[in-house]
């Protein structure tokens, strides 16, 4: 399955609780909670580029499945992680006590991030 495309956020659950759990300042949480960000994914074999635009903030991360890479987290912090593919439609990684699962189903992408007992879920649709 090729994951390339542009996707816009439709819904999110537990945004504020998750952002607090990962140390995001309250003023940034308030600014970001209603933004319907756009993610552009470019896949070339096992190599991926994610460009995430939320308001004026743009985060660009590149990785190759199964290889350690450095990525920018939503807090602006640089992290090291290894992204794996599970089955035909899931990208999974764990970093700093956070498990991230991105699942592709047709024109819908569901991203779930879990830290402790706080689960943040974001659903995006292809545009």
Swiss-Prot record:
Source organism, top-level taxon:
Eukaryota
Main localization (coarse) = cytoplasm
Provide the alphabetized UniProt keywords.
Acetylation, Cytoplasm, Isopeptide bond, Lipid-binding, Phosphoprotein, Transport
GO cellular component, alphabetical, reads: cytosol; nucleoplasm; nucleus
Q: By which gene is this protein encoded?
A: FABP1
Entry GO MF terms: antioxidant activity; chromatin binding; fatty acid binding
- The cross-link Isoaspartyl glycine isopeptide (Asn-Gly) sits at 105-106
Q: What is known of its domains?
A: Forms a beta-barrel structure that accommodates hydrophobic ligands in its interior.
Q: Which family does it belong to?
A: Belongs to the calycin superfamily. Fatty-acid binding protein (FABP) family.
Task: State the protein's name.
Answer: Fatty acid-binding protein, liver
The protein's role, per its UniProt record: Plays a role in lipoprotein-mediated cholesterol uptake in hepatocytes. Binds cholesterol. Binds free fatty acids and their coenzyme A derivatives, bilirubin, and some other small molecules in the cytoplasm. May be involved in intracellular lipid transport.
Residues bearing the modification N-acetylmethionine: 1
* Location of this chain's protein in the cell: Cytoplasm
Q: Name positions with the PTM Deamidated asparagine.
A: 105
Per the record, residues carrying N6-succinyllysine are 31, 36, 46, 57, 78, 90, 121
Post-translational changes noted in the entry: Deamidation and transpeptidation at the beta carboxyl of Asn-105 forms an isoaspartyl residue and Edman degradation appears as though blocked. This rearrangement gives rise to an extra negative charge carried by the acid form.
């Amino acid at each position: 399955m090729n994951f390339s495309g542009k996707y816009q956020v439709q819904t999110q659950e537990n945004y504020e609780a998750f952002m607090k759990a990962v140390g995001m300042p309250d003023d940034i949480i308030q600014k970001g909670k209603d933004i319907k960000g756009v993610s552009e994914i470019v896949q070339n074999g096992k190599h991926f580029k994610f460009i995430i635009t939320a308001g004026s903030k743009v985060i660009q991360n590149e990785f190759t499945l199964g290889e350690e890479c450095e990525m920018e987290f939503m807090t602006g912090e640089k992290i090291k992680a290894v992204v794996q593919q599970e089955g035909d439609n899931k990208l999974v990684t764990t970093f700093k006590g956070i498990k991230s699962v991105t699942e592709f189903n047709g024109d819908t992408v569901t991203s779930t991030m879990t830290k402790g007992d706080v689960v943040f879920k974001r659903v995006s649709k292809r545009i």
